[in-house]
Amino acid sequence: MARGGPGRVLVAQVVGSGRGVAARPAFEPGRPMQLLRRSQGDARIGDLVTVRERGRSAEVLGVLGPTTRPAAVMAALLADADVRVKHPSAVTREAEAIPGRLGAGDPGRRDLTGQVAITIDPEGAKDHDDALSIAREGEDLRLWVHIADVARYVPAGGAIDREAARRGNSVYVPGTVAPMLPRRLSTDLCSLRPGEVRDVVTAEMLVRPDGTVDDARFFRAAILSRERLTYPGVDAVLAGAAQAPPGLEEAVTLAAEAARRLHARRMARGALEVTSGEPAFTIGPDRVESAVVEGQTPAHSLVEECMIAANEAVARFMVARKAPTVFRYHEDPAGPPVLRLYEQLEELGVPLPPIADGPLGPQQAREAVSAAAEALGAHIVALGEDGARAASALWGLLLRSLRQAYYTPDHVGHSGLASAAYLHFTSPIRRYPDLLVHRGLLDQLGIGDPGPDASTCAEAAAHSSSTERDAVGIERRADRVALALLLERLLGERAIEIEQDGTVTGVVDAGLFVAFGDVFDGFLPVRRLGGDWYRTHPLDIGLVGEGTGRRVMIGDPIRVRVVRVEALRGRVELEPAALGPSRALTRRRARLGGR
C-alpha cells in the first residue's frame, strides 16, 4: 500500500471525532483524518477501511469490516502489506477456462490410481501439494512421493504464470491465505483431494536400511488419494492411541519407518536439528477461539523426511544433467557468530563440548553448531519442566547464529541439511521456484515443455527470495496480532489471569521479551523493572542491575502482569509481578548501551 506522497492509500480505523467520524491509521502512528461524508458509505465506527488521503481529510475506498472480526483484521494486514488475496480478472478467467483434469490423455503418464496414496497435512489445509505411497521390498522400502503436476495446468508465459511469478509464494495468515495460484487450481484441480483422480509428478525412490536413497526415477502419473490424514491423527496412530483408517495402517507405519531411516542418515552426515514451534489458531467468525504452539511431532517428521529425500533426489538429477534450475542454498555459518553463540550458551549454564581455538572455517563452524545443538537439546531435557519453558529462548540464540537460506541458480549446497545439492520440488502450488523446478525436470525427462533458461532461473531465484522474506515477516506479524486479539478477549472475559508465569526469551537495550501462558509473548520495558539501573549484558543475553548486580537473563523465569494490549499492532506491554531466580551460572557486570 502506498506510503508516501499526496493522496497516499492506507488502512485506517474509523473513530468518532466530535460530531463526525475520522479515520485513524490502523498500523502506524498518525493523526486522525476527517472522513469525507460522501465517501463514508457503510463504514461505521470501529470498522477497518482503506482510505485515500485528501489533505487533512480522507476518502473511503473500501470497508474491510469491524476490528472485532479476525477476518477483517487479517484482510487489513494483508492490504497494509500490499498483498493481494484476489487474483486479477485475467488470471481468474484463464483459470476458470480450464475444463477439468487435463492429464488423462497424456502420453507416458502412468496410472497409479490402484496404489494406496495418502496425504498428511495440518487440520484445515485445503491446498494439498503432496501425497505418499510406500511398499516393502525385502529389507528396502520403495517410496513414491507424488507432487501436484502444476506445470500441466500453468504454461509458462500465461496470465496465471506471470501472476504466480510476481507473487513468488502464497502468504498464510490466521484464518486465510493469499494464494500464489487462483483457488480454481490451488484448492481444486491441482490439490490432491481424496477420492479424486489427480495429475502428479512422482519421485520414486528406494530407501535402504541405512537410509541411503537409490534407484531414483521421475515421471508423470495419475493417483487417487485414499484419505486425507492430519498430523494429529497420524501422531495418534503412531503412538498407538488410535487406529488408522481401514487399509491405511501399513502405509502409515512403513512411511514412519522410511522417515526414521532417512532421518538417521541425515543426522549421521552432520545435519542440524533444531526444535521450534509456531502458533496454530482456531478462528471463529467473530473471534480468535484459541491458539496452541505446534512443535515438530513424529507425523511432521514423517512428511518432512520424505519431502527432503525427494528434493535431494531431484537436485542430484538436475546437477548430473547440468540443467538450469533454482536451488535452495543454506550457507555454512560464519565463525564469529558461532564463537559468540558458544560464549552465550556457556554464560547461560549450558554444558558444551570443547571448541577449536582461533578462527573457525566454514566446515568447523558447521560442525560446532551441530555439536552445540546436540548439547543444547540434551541440556533442555535434563532441566525437565524448567528446560521446556526455556527451550524456545535457547533455541532462538542458536538460530540467530545461522545464515538465512535463499534461492539461487547455482549448485552449492545446504548446510543445515548437510546436503551437497538441494532444491524445492514438493510445493509447486505455493512456491514459484518449485514450479520452475518441475518445468526443468520434465524438460530433461523429455515429457514436458521447454524448461526455464539460466536467466529465468536467476531472476526467479532473486525475486522469490525477496517475496519469501516479505511473507515470513507478514506471517509473523499476523500471528502476533491474532495472539493479541486472543489475549485481549481472554482478559476481557476474565478467562485468564492478568498475572502470568513467564520466561525471558530476548533482550534489547529497551527491555525484555517475555513468553508467558501457553502461547503469548510480550515486552517488558526496562523502565518497569525498577529498583536499579539495568544495563545490557555484553553478550546481549540479559540485563544486569548496576547497583545490585541483579541479573535477568534469557531463559530465566519471571512472573509478569499484563499492562496494555494493542491488538492491531500485536503489542503486549508487561510489568514484573515478581522476578524468579536467575539460572545463569556466572555473575558479570555490563553497561546499558555500551559494550
Map each language-model feature to its residues:
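Short, surface-exposed loop motifs enriched in S/T, G, D/E and P with embedded aromatic residues
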Residues: 12-14, 502, 560
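Electropositive polyanion-binding surfaces
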Residues: 90-534, 540, 555, 565-572, ...
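Short nucleic-acid-contacting surface segments enriched for D/E, G, S/T with interspersed K/R
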Residues: 37-51, 493-499, 534-560
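Intrinsically disordered, low-complexity regions enriched in proline, serine, glycine
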Residues: 72, 571-574
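Short amphipathic alpha-helical linker/capping segments at the junctions of internal repeats
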Residues: 578-582
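Terminal, basic amphipathic appendages of nucleotide-handling enzymes
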Residues: 1-130, 170-172, 226-235, 584-595
